[in-house]
């Protein structure tokens, strides 16, 4: 049986959430509360029994793999295979707020009907990790300023692509984290199959409440998450 802990994480007090008191250099402590559902056993991308959202508020943070087994994960910032050329996560996990997870699951159900599904490159990002990224690349064109934080830090943004039901990535024209005009949504100087793949991704995500960034075909923000607070909890690693 899976065991879960519901943690109220005060970022100015120690009440059980790993690294909850960590201060980012040059930043004041985050002093609000977030509820986080933590799997206290070894992580498993496909748990035998899926959890439900019953009784959870829309702002609760959850591990997406505990609520759906229909996604694929390639969490790039837990590796050096990213534009930073640095590993900034201790281990690969995909956490979001409940409202983000609900929208992602609904969108993915529609994708599956079209023979594809979502593959994740990044999800919730602790604010302290945003500072690590800023130290490596202190350029707001590529990394959001951690003082204000980003929607990734709020649990409402994801970096994604589409794969077939057998796990083969659709061609989107560039790799994740390619910064150039070829990755722009408004770049139509691409083969038709790539344009069709991007259109399917964008139109479906928008249908379920997400909006995109013009320069990154992979990045989607949940509109309903814009006013949420920046968070800084870190998930446990083995």
Regions found by a protein language model. Give the residues of each.
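Extended, low-complexity, intrinsically disordered C-terminal regulatory tails
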Residues: 121-135
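Extracytoplasmic cell-surface/polysaccharide-interacting catalytic and binding patches
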Residues: 22-121, 136, 140-215, 221-238
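Sec-dependent signal peptide recognition
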Residues: 2-8
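C-terminal motif of bacterial Sec signal peptides marking the signal peptidase cleavage site
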Residues: 13-16
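Short, conserved catalytic or interaction motifs in soluble domains
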Residues: 19
């Amino acid at each position: 049986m899976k065991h879960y802990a519901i943690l109220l994480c005060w970022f100015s007090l120690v009440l059980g959430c790993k690294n909850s008191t960590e201060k980012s250099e040059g930043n004041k402590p985050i002093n609000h509360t977030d509820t986080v559902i933590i799997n206290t056993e070894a992580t498993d991308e496909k748990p035998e029994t899926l959890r439900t959202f019953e009784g959870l508020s829309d702002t609760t943070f959850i591990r997406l793999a505990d609520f759906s087994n229909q996604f694929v994960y390639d969490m790039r910032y837990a590796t050096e295979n990213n534009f930073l050329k640095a590993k900034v996560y201790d281990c690969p996990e995909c956490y979001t707020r409940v409202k983000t997870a609900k929208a992602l699951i609904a969108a993915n159900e529609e994708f599956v009907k079209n023979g594809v599904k979502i593959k994740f490159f990044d999800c919730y990002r602790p604010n302290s990790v945003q500072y690590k990224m800023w130290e490596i690349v202190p350029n707001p064109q590529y990394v959001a300023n951690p003082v204000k934080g980003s929607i990734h830090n709020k649990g409402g943004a994801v970096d994604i692509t589409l794969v077939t039901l057998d796990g083969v990535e659709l061609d989107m024209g560039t790799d994740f984290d390619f910064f150039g005009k070829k990755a722009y949504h408004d770049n139509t100087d691409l083969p038709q199959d790539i344009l069709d793949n991007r259109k399917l991704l964008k139109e479906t995500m928008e249908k379920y409440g997400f909006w995109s960034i013009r320069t990154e075909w992979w990045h989607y923000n949940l509109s309903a998450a814009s006013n949420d607070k920046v968070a800084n909890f870190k998930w446990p690693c083995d």
